[in-house]
């Protein structure tokens, strides 16, 4: 290596984002400046609000840089998770870079790993809502061309890794005229978050990727040769389209005429520079003209148009030839719309009459094999080679750019072999079902021969349901809510309230749960009490993450709230669980947004207790009571004398086994669809029943007793003053002691003392140190003469 490029201590910086190219090239002092390292440090200290972005001054003349990475994770990892993730991150990226350097640059694999792992600096962002840092490998040098060539390799690593830091590598920084924010400076004047240094590195030069100081511990590698410099032994293959047609395609791309067009032939078109008559700007990049000519190369059965000199100063254009069979195979498979990219970055594949995720098994490869016989004969033979299948799969992934919205059909129930329309009862299969893009399903096949009303299973099931929730006048409202709640589990839309299944032990709650799980399969998930009692935030929460797109979530066995130490149900959680999007991510994942389609059912033997009660909470709670007890013969007499039960039935010991064997799967599914049509067509409706919650009694009643005072009540002050009201700051108010006397007429202080005190503390105001009042008026005081 030339000694002239073994050192660089002049740092070129941009003073803002988006500096015009002309100002950058002319080094306009308003926009750019060059510093020595000590000068740069002083400038930052003297201008703490400055915005500086490090960049190469002239990439064509000098492009030696340190290997660097920008990581930006939209979540805050705790210290233990961060330390584990950063260790794995260093190992993963060093292995990846070493493999690339060995393959493309002829570097020594072990030397690259040693230089990267032994010396690097790490910044830390002051933004506490995310994990963001720059990492500079201080003794590992390369060229900007090499980093740009490495971009795709790092992108594949970030997509395949399970490490959240590796998945958050910003590969967009590997480009021409790239910039990296200088440590200690802001992104823009209004942003007060910065990247700070971390020990043991406290010199600013340790955080600059363009600073070069090679020593005995340094290691340098670069690309051995450019791909466009490689000329194949045999240029034009028999399977290609004619050379004349191919070169006409090239001519149409340029728009401007190619002066030496007639000089090109099959043997020299890769070596003869194209002489363009720039009557209009370049059709590829819109620049007025180019100093260096364009040239053609032949790679992977396609003509590649690139510019000599700096090839990145103009766009590279690929002209596919019909002879590129693997590219055409990928295009043909994409044209069938059998592979799609979801909003969350997952690939889904239409195979065996249903949409499936590509994450757990190589479904794209299976799709390629299954579609092989539908392709022309000259294509199908290519797919017998595993290496070529991998190439086709890579082409498909690269060609999929636009994501699609999925699971937007709330009235469709997906199965392994098709989709059931809940409104008209039609079952769609094959291509008819393909248009309903759903990424989750029941996980079993629909069988229309079992999906009938008249069957022995249906007769048995109706007896079970009628035992659990009797069809009596006293239980009519409860039975209706039971049917509404269970049938809403078929609907793929956000539900407005949560339902508590409340009753003593052995009253049919768990039997209902098992029947529902059997009927909707993988669309059902059972979770713990933590979704109700723990704070819901951006941190790892597999319970919430597992709710994504599920249609029924069953939360079983709430604690006895009378026990000391038991957590109350968080009112905020109830509100969040009725929103379309619930925040919570799986461990080591950036996917924090979960679409909430679930009917959330809480199975409890104990009266629910909430940390805070308000109108918003009461609008979101429904209660189904279970009062039929299923007893063994030995306990029947005691159960019949228990006031908690309306009826006592003998326990069927074999029922659980029948449910687990899915005996009632399609019978119950038929019943759910029937109830769905009865209650939820055309609009899905679930109504709360706050009157069923004892803790809500005070708040429901007090809303009928009080109104907030306002200016319209001032004319009534003559009569109101006789009833204890006073006028304070032009507002009718009620002294605290008077309020307590009046409220005691409606509520027993022994039963509702805590609720009354809580209401007063929330709404009372102070006239002075000793006088307290409330800005409320009793309705009877303004309605009575």
UniProtKB/Swiss-Prot annotation:
The UniProt record lists the keyword Glycoprotein: no
PROSITE patterns xref list: SF3_HELICASE_1 (PS51206)
Broad class of enzyme this protein falls into: hydrolase
Subcellular localization(s) per the UniProt record: Host cytoplasm
One GO MF term: helicase activity
Binding residue positions for ATP: 503-510
Name of the featured protein: Uncoating factor OPG117
Organism: Vaccinia virus (strain Copenhagen)
